Amino acid sequence: MKLWELLNGIPVASCAVDLEMEITGVSYDSRATQPGDLFVAMTGYATDGHKYIATALEKGAAAVLCQNLPEGEGPYIRTADSRRALAVIGANWFGHPAEEMTMIAVTGTCGKTTTTYLLKAILEQARGAKVGLIGTNQNMIGQEVIPTDRTTPESFEVQRLFREMADAGCAYAVMETSSHALCLDRVYGVYYAVGIFTNLTQDHLDFHVTMENYCDAKAILFRNCGVGVVNGDDPWTPRLLKDATCQVRTYGVKSEADLRAENVVLSANGIAFDAVTKTERVPIRVNIPGGFMVYNTLDVLGAALALGISLKDSAAVLAKVPHVQGRVEVVPTPGKDYTILIDYAHTPDSMVNVLQTVKEFAKGRTVAVFGCGGDRDKTKRPRMGKAAADWSDFAVVTTDNPRTEEPAAIIRDILPGFDDSNTPYEVVEDRVEAIRWAMDHAQKDDVIVLCGKGHETYQEVNHQKFHMDEREIVAEHLNSGR
């Protein structure tokens, strides 16, 4: 592709390169740079790509797009925002694949993964369409699974995925869109037919610093979509919509929303309610338990309506949809009189949600096994402890992904959450041993909730990911005869 074609739509401040030059690839990581590439130097959250311009040139980069010009002469192109430019370059390189599909984005603290999976099922079964998915658990093209390690990939990889989806015949792309992705322009230039807002609770304050900043990052989506389907019960929604340019449709249980849930029934086997609009009332049943599932279901129904799918057609699909991996997932414990659940709950509110759900049906104790991630928002650690203290009958405090922090230091930050509580707890630093300890000390009818890892099958320690699948840990301990 000619350099000028690649730079189309990017404001260029200066250029010391022939725009007719043929570019054979694009890289933003100097370690992956190939001869003939355009290297894009970005200022990142953890490092600055400008430090690696010399390395990229040594590896054969034909040109460099940057914000800050290096000293001396070179094949440099300067722009005001190279991160945003990478998103435009990705769309140009892959031929604007998002324009070939109907795009749907889901943002919010909790519920994004469940929402995307439910909506994907409705589009596939009610519309007979092939659907692409980008999410925390995995990326999918139809039924083909593509592993992932972040909620929203870098912008160039997002465009690569869109191209693969479009080429495979996907009519829709449904994606989890994190606040990081919106703030860091990973989806810059993508216009969504529908944007969904689930909720906003404390998370990622290591990055955003304040809840106001966190909300404002989410709000970017609603200046780049046609219809916004938003939680009318969430107190952050008015701020979220302050500068919105989309048509807004609300859903809720408490508010006078466009789409409401009435006659809600919660059970161990799932949820049921009437979905009510100004013109109809349709009974809904989903075989996933938890009060929070009412909201996850409402936002999906609202999005489907915005896409022209009736409540009745959506209801027929939702009644048959299976569990989502790592979300209130039951782990087999044959021959035992206790239950083990795995859930991705890794924020104070999501822990409260899942433990409340378990309390609704548990005949015995609710036992929470949890930790907090290292190198992340420290202020939520005591709140995680308080969530466990308030909503479990016993807690096992352990590690999550400690990353570069000492696990014992993270645990010390969690424990003040138990200060005003009589809830007993045990500290078992090693997560594998913590799970085994909980199983060994389980009582009849206990429900042990392994919080935090969910779909993840690894533990991150000192920049390395080690295999750790909680399903395997449970099975191996059971097989050991313990």
Model region roles, listed by residue range:
Residues 5, 9, 66, 70-74, ...:
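Acidic, Mg2+-coordinating active-site environments of NTP-dependent enzymes
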